[in-house]
């Protein structure tokens, strides 16, 4: 199925060819709940490969899922090879490959965006769009043309959009199309976040109900970090020059180490417990690694296999991070990697998503760091019984 790459934007040397750029065909603007255009940037080859009858509906049995994991996923595998070994659910494979194609195009559009006084823009067909809106449209198109997504919503379009896929054997997807879009002009790393839930529900569910989550990281390297419910670990794929996603790392444990990323520091003004926590990091000579982008700040915990990210609220610094679009998917990635997440009292994967725009504070990191986070903010930790707080450099 990697052959569908030809229908997307060929990466590497081909992407730098003016002729290739001119030949690129995009659809009209994505129009939720309206008639869809006859063509897409995916082209007819992807349309042909994603016919609704391509894969049988229905969830795999637990026995089949376990059997699929007997074949070890290997470093060096392509995305398709990895997914074929990681899950027997062909619908989920198709959805993740389509999202990978969209993120490859987003990476190119971010890299070539024109940044003026108010926004960074690039072309989408005949339109000039802010790059976050362009990413939003590309991801909605990817989900529509996967033919296995029932509902989708995004941080830019926080209402359920019917993608036309089945309920039984299909999925609902929530995504942040371009987290950190305000720092594109400064050339900082930005990214895409998405979570995949089975069926047609995105409320009344928890982050723990996800069957997969992923993030795309658009920085010096373009990477695609994926975790699946029935596959151990969190897995990183690198976008090669020829446009292929290659499996380059798996993470199954997050150890102790003195690295911190403190978000929403203005909350330390009137949240003395958060101020105490940040001062502890400084006093203990933790290494500060904070970019202002949630995706790279969380991704470094998975890559370095240590550290903590915090984003805490206060009476005057309210919660901004969205549970559905950002917090739960990233929590899934961290916990599948062997780390922990917390809203101060519980794992973010245990929080019921009551409304699409629900917001929360959060911390991600190693077990001991989450214990320290919970104990400092609330006096006790649900994790403390089985671990001793302490970090090593």
UniProtKB/Swiss-Prot annotation:
Q: What is this protein called?
A: Sedoheptulose-1,7-bisphosphatase, chloroplastic
Annotated Mg(2+) 2 binding lies at: 155, 176, 178
The top EC class is hydrolase
Q: In which pathway does it act?
A: Carbohydrate biosynthesis; Calvin cycle
Note whether Transmembrane helix occurs among the keywords.
Answer: no
- Its GO biological process terms? fructose 1,6-bisphosphate metabolic process; fructose 6-phosphate metabolic process; fructose metabolic process; gluconeogenesis; reductive pentose-phosphate cycle
Q: How is the co-factor bound, per the entry? A: Binds 3 Mg(2+) ions per subunit.
This enzyme catalyses: D-sedoheptulose 1,7-bisphosphate + H2O = D-sedoheptulose 7-phosphate + phosphate
Q: What induces it?
A: Light activation through pH changes, Mg(2+) levels and also by light-modulated reduction of essential disulfide groups via the ferredoxin-thioredoxin f system. In etiolated seedlings, induction occurs only after 4 hours of illumination.
InterPro entries listed in its UniProt record: FBPase_C_dom (IPR044015), FBPase_class-1 (IPR000146), FBPase_N (IPR033391), Fructose_bisphosphatase_AS (IPR020548), SBPase (IPR023079)
Q: Where does substrate bind?
A: 179-182, 290, 320
Description of how the protein assembles with itself and partners: Homodimer.
Species, as recorded: Triticum aestivum (Wheat)
Essential cofactor(s): Mg(2+)
Which keywords label this protein?
Calvin cycle, Carbohydrate metabolism, Chloroplast, Disulfide bond, Hydrolase, Magnesium, Metal-binding, Plastid, Transit peptide
Highest taxon in the source lineage: Eukaryota
């Amino acid at each position: 199925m990697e052959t569908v790459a030809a229908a997307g934007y060929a990466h590497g040397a081909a992407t730098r060819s003016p002729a290739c750029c001119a030949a690129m065909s995009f659809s009209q603007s994505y129009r939720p709940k309206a008639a869809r255009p006859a063509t897409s940037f995916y082209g007819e080859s992807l349309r042909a490969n994603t016919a609704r009858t391509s894969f049988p509906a229905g969830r795999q049995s637990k026995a089949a899922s376990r059997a699929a994991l007997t074949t070890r996923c290997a470093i060096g595998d392509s995305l398709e090879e990895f997914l074929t070994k990681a899950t027997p659910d062909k619908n989920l494979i198709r959805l993740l490959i389509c999202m990978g194609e969209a993120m490859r195009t987003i990476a190119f559009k971010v890299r070539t965006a024109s940044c003026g006084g108010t926004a960074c823009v690039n072309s989408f067909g005949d339109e000039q769009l802010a790059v976050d809106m362009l990413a939003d449209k590309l991801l909605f198109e990817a989900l529509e043309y996967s033919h296995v997504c029932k509902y989708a919503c995004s941080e830019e379009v926080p209402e359920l959009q019917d993608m036309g896929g089945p309920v039984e054997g299909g999925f609902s997807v929530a995504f942040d199309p371009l987290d950190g879009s305000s720092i594109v002009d400064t050339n900082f790393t930005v990214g895409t976040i998405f979570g995949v839930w089975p069926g047609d529900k995105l409320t009344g569910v928890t982050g723990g109900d996800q069957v997969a989550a992923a993030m795309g990281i658009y920085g010096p390297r373009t990477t695609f970090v994926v975790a699946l419910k029935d596959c151990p670990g969190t897995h990183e794929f690198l976008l090669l020059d020829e446009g292929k996603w290659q499996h380059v790392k798996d993470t199954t444990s997050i150890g102790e180490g003195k690295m911190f990323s403190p978000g929403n520091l203005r909350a330390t003004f009137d949240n003395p417990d958060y101020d105490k926590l940040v001062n502890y990091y400084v006093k203990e000579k933790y290494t500060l690694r904070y970019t202002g982008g949630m995706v790279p700040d969380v991704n470094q915990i998975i890559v370095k296999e240590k550290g903590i990210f915090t984003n805490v609220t206060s009476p005057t610094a309210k919660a901004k991070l969205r549970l559905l679009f950002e917090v739960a998917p990233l929590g899934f990635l961290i916990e599948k990697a062997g780390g922990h997440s917390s809203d101060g009292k519980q794992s973010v994967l245990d929080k019921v998503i009551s409304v699409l725009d629900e917001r929360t504070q959060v911390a991600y990191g190693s077990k001991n760091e989450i214990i320290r986070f919970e104990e400092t903010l609330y006096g006790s930790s649900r994790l403390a019984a089985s671990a001793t707080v302490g970090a090593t450099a």
